Amino acid sequence: NEKNIILSGSVLVENFMDIDLTEIKLLKKVVVSNVNHSIVLDKLKENLIHFDCPIIEVISESNEELINDYSDQSTLGVDRWLAAMGAWKIYGEDLIVINAGTAITIDLIQIDQKRKAHFRGGMILPGIAISLGILNNSTNLIDTEIGQSQYPSLNTKDAVTTGILTSIQGAVNLVCKKLPSDLPILLSGGDADLIFSQSEDDWKSRIKIESDLIFEGLMSYV
């Protein structure tokens, strides 16, 4: 029986090298999404060399399923591309794709008159953790934990949290106003639940949370 193994983040960097590869009898293909340093890919190739199987590093270029409309496809982050691929694979329709991770990306997929799917691009905002880190480094804030989103806020933690989440809401509202009101919104990433909880009612009903959207996109290359 063929099986797929999906490893992510620190699992790949720290623990994957400790797996007893002798227990794996056959590898037909390895598909890698790497947004950091090439050292990760080099280590992976070194550990898998005796399997003599192709190692495919996903790049953000057009394929038969989805056309990348970016002016320079090579500059599109592979995580954004895979989220779009995963969204299209699951739903196959016009939609907004929000990936809330280190950065928050709000992207658009549209089908043209020839029924071809296009990644139209979108916008990028600092993620919640990055925003907290920037404020902490610039203003010497002591507390960088997420607080309550409420206005007016009566303490710094809540005031910062309210500001960050309100900026994200504002960006999503802007996108929603520019596009058809019935367009589905796919929300993924580590902060998806937090953003969903703070969403406004007029577009909250359109949101579908897909926790493994990037991995769904990765499976398109298996």
Language-model features: locations:
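Short beta-strand scaffold segments in enzyme catalytic cores
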Residues: N1, V97-I98, I104-Q110
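Nucleotide/phosphate-binding catalytic cleft detector across ATP-hydrolyzing
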Residues: E2-L95, K116-V222
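Short glycine-enriched loops at secondary-structure junctions
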Residues: E61, T102-A103
